[in-house]
């Protein structure tokens, strides 16, 4: 595993812990499909939450939050649609897209959780 992949996995673990501590329940982690991957799929009450976790060591080319551009949002929306098709149990539940942006050194204080980060 590369250093970048290791940092990404650590960021996902930090995000998962933070969201779980905030009352969300994990449904899936790293769910893959032809449109890409959903980092975390969680349940907040009865709302299915698709969480994109972004980690940036530095902001020279933009921060973690800015890296979730329109193209990335479209891929996440398509992946979420495929998830809901594959898991019909959740298809009638309300959904939202959250982003957890983490900047180095990757401590809880460096975590920014944006609920409803974008609309589908």
From Swiss-Prot:
<dbReference type="GO" id="GO:0003676">
    <property type="term" value="F:nucleic acid binding"/>
</dbReference>
<comment type="similarity">
    <text>Belongs to the UPF0102 family.</text>
</comment>
<protein>
    <recommendedName>
        <fullName>UPF0102 protein PST_1070</fullName>
    </recommendedName>
</protein>
<dbReference type="InterPro" id="IPR011856">
    <property type="entry name" value="tRNA_endonuc-like_dom_sf"/>
</dbReference>
<dbReference type="Pfam" id="PF02021">
    <property type="entry name" value="UPF0102"/>
</dbReference>
<dbReference type="InterPro" id="IPR011335">
    <property type="entry name" value="Restrct_endonuc-II-like"/>
</dbReference>
<dbReference type="InterPro" id="IPR003509">
    <property type="entry name" value="UPF0102_YraN-like"/>
</dbReference>
């Amino acid at each position: 595993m590369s250093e970048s992949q290791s940092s990404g996995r650590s960021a996902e673990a930090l995000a998962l812990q933070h969201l779980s501590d905030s009352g969300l329940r994990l449904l899936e982690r790293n769910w893959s499909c032809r449109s890409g991957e959903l980092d975390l799929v969680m349940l907040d009450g009865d709302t299915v939450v698709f969480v994109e976790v972004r980690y940036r060591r530095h902001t020279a080319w933009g921060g973690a939050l800015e890296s979730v551009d329109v193209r990335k949002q479209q891929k996440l929306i398509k992946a979420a649609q495929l998830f809901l098709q594959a898991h019909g149990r959740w298809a009638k539940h309300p959904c939202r897209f959250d982003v957890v942006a983490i900047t180095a050194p990757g401590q809880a204080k460096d975590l920014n959780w944006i609920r409803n980060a974008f609309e589908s």
